[in-house]
A protein has these predicted regions:
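Glycine-rich flavin
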Residues: 2-5, 21-28, 32-155
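Beta1/beta-strand and adjacent pyrophosphate-binding region of the FAD-binding site
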Residues: 2-15
Length: 155
């Protein structure tokens, strides 16, 4: 027997996770299915912007701007900073931490709003008068079925 939800959102990017949270706030039982996995093997909600686009690029940009200020602009303020070096591996590590903090924040919002998160790839399996059955394949290739009265495709 598959788990039944009022709404199933396929995709945990900026459109999907917000749709899932809002549906839950409106009193619906909601599941969100997303297959993205971070470097640590854990779910990486938030879509392209959060994981490989806007957020990581802005984190790296901020680090490089601090480097530029230390090298070129501190002296204007009477601050002497000699032999300033860039540690790219630390910059990357900081960027990864910022991304993880965003991923974890979305998972927290799901928990707070009672959205069931399912880590896997969803595919339509069948339909009947009461909704749609989705087959969700996890990274370990196990498959579970869930049913939703309404499906939001946000991929």
């Amino acid at each position: 027997m598959s788990k039944q939800f009022d709404v199933v959102v396929i995709g945990g990017g900026p459109g999907g996770y917000i749709a899932a949270i809002r549906a839950a706030q409106l009193g619906k039982t909601v599941a969100c299915v997303d297959a993205a996995t971070g470097k640590d093997g854990k779910p990486a909600l938030g879509g392209t912007c959060t994981n490989v686009g806007c957020i990581p690029s802005k984190a790296l940009l901020q680090s490089s701007e601090h480097f530029e200020h230390a090298n070129l602009h501190f002296a204007e303020h009477g601050i002497s900073a000699k032999d300033v070096k860039m540690d790219v591996s630390k910059m990357i590590s900081r960027k990864d931490g910022v991304v993880k903090q965003n991923n974890d924040g979305i998972l927290y919002l799901f928990k707070k709003n009672k959205v069931t998160f399912i880590h896997g790839r969803a595919a339509f399996a069948k339909t009947d008068g009461g909704g749609y059955t989705l087959a969700v394949t996890a990274n370990d290739k196990s498959v579970q079925e869930i049913t939703g009265t309404h499906i939001v495709v946000a991929t």
